Amino acid sequence: MSSPDQNPSDAAGQTGSSNEEVVDVRRGMFGVKGTGDTSGYGRLVREIVLPGSSPRPYGFYFDEIADRLAEALNRDGVEFEDAIEKVVVYRNELTLHVRREALLRVAQSLRDEPELRFELCLGVNGVHYPHETGRELHAVYPLQSITHNRRLRLEVSAPDSDPHIPSLYAVYPTNDWHERETYDFFGIIFDGHPSLTRIEMPDDWQGHPQRKDYPLGGIPVEYKGAQIPPPDERRGYN
């Protein structure tokens, strides 16, 4: 297994990206408004910022990955810009934001091209940005090249109104349960998955509990008919 020939801390373009995008401003620990909480974070206000597109050179081995992927896509009649929305280098990590209709082609090229060989997909994570209109749901795939000792991420977005993303099961079969979990918790529908059913919540569960718009629930207590209210409804002391 080869080692990268440059330390990412020395790479050009590794410090950040341009055109950062503010997708939300959260107040308090749970992002609720108009009510108190007992967490001690009731006065916390922070912007949720997503890094923007990075300019070339990306640094480290990232330029080589982009170039080899572009060549592979071109052989299949696909332009790099038609498949990749943006390339982000942030905190020494490479993320390719992929258009969802091109996800399977990009993943297969990354897996099969000898100079890329990202043989391992470590699963898929869901993210929900309710204020990012038209791109509220994100699926993030960490990839690892065992051959070349390299890492990158693929990120795909979909709107709440059309939460469909192609399944990567055909390219990375080990994503089977990971896609089921992301569907279970975020409601992303992975088209082409052989058995997209809930994997942790009961089959008749209503909603997807890791979405930001999912209501915070209280805890039923078995004695005296009491119920602990959800965090955003508790009395505040600040």
UniProtKB/Swiss-Prot annotation:
EC number: 7.1.1.-
Keyword annotations: Cell membrane, Membrane, NAD, Quinone, Translocase, Transport
Region annotated Disordered, chain positions: 1-20
Topology in the lipid bilayer: Peripheral membrane protein
Pfam families according to UniProt: Complex1_30kDa
Cited InterPro entries: NADH_DH_suC, NADH_quin_OxRdtase_su_C/D-like, NADH_UbQ_OxRdtase_30kDa_su
UniProt subcellular location: Cell membrane
Catalysis performed (reactions): a quinone + NADH + 5 H(+)(in) = a quinol + NAD(+) + 4 H(+)(out)
GO molecular function: NADH dehydrogenase (ubiquinone) activity; NADH:ubiquinone reductase (non-electrogenic) activity; quinone binding
Primary residence: membrane
Family listed: Belongs to the complex I 30 kDa subunit family.
HAMAP family: NDH1_NuoC (MF_01357)
Function, in words: NDH-1 shuttles electrons from NADH, via FMN and iron-sulfur (Fe-S) centers, to quinones in the respiratory chain. The immediate electron acceptor for the enzyme in this species is believed to be a menaquinone. Couples the redox reaction to proton translocation (for every two electrons transferred, four hydrogen ions are translocated across the cytoplasmic membrane), and thus conserves the redox energy in a proton gradient.
Quaternary structure and partners: NDH-1 is composed of 14 different subunits. Subunits NuoB, C, D, E, F, and G constitute the peripheral sector of the complex.
Protein name: NADH-quinone oxidoreductase subunit C
